[in-house]
């Protein structure tokens, strides 16, 4: 059974462009980092992941992002998650309580020198082992996307497309390489409370 959910037109072109502008205008952007070392510290490792990142906290964001979250990001995630749960209804029965994680990342990968180059999963250390589901929304059309290795599946980066999948070791993934042009996305998680 395929546990990768793909939902198109979850955000409009205008909504995606507003989030991209928010990202580009932010003075809080930083180089993309990895935290898979188990300590939770941010490490810049361009051979693994190279690009730009903006971490946003649901509990502590500015008014502009708060409005984007309230008006369309969270409703879009709710809509997509509702569709995903139709395929996997057991998610609401027999599991411990779970909810959206406080933080998420807006990311940009620009050109063949940038991307997330290595296979990884989203729940691979004791620090993030409570993650159960990953959500990612592509903010623009790009000539690349995400590669899942088991099952083998490529998901093309398409503006407004939501992708949901299990966070664990069963779903290793990476960016499709080479990265051609600009690719913008938002990535976050649903975790056990």
What is the role of each PLM region?
Residues 1-134, 138-162, 170-193:
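Fe(II)/2-oxoglutarate oxygenase catalytic core
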């Amino acid at each position: 059974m395929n546990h990768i959910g793909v939902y198109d037109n979850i955000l409009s072109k205008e909504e995606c462009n507003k989030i991209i502008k928010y990202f580009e205008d932010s003075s809080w952007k930083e180089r993309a980092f990895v935290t898979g070392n188990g300590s939770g510290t941010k490490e810049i490792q361009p051979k693994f992941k190279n690009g730009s990142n903006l971490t946003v906290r649901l509990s502590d964001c500015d008014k502009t992002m708060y409005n984007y979250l309230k008006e369309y990001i969270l409703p879009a995630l709710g809509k997509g998650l509702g569709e995903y749960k139709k395929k996997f209804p057991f998610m609401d029965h027999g599991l411990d309580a779970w909810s959206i994680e406080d933080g998420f990342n807006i990311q940009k990968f620009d050109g063949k020198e940038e991307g997330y180059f290595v296979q990884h999963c989203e729940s691979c250390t004791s620090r993030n082992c409570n993650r159960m589901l990953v959500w990612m929304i592509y903010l623009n059309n790009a000539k690349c996307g995400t590669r899942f290795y088991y099952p083998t599946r490529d998901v093309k980066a398409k503006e407004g497309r939501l992708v949901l999948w299990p966070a664990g070791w069963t779903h290793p993934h990476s960016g499709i390489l080479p990265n051609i042009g600009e690719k913008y996305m938002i990535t976050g998680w649903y975790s056990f409370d």
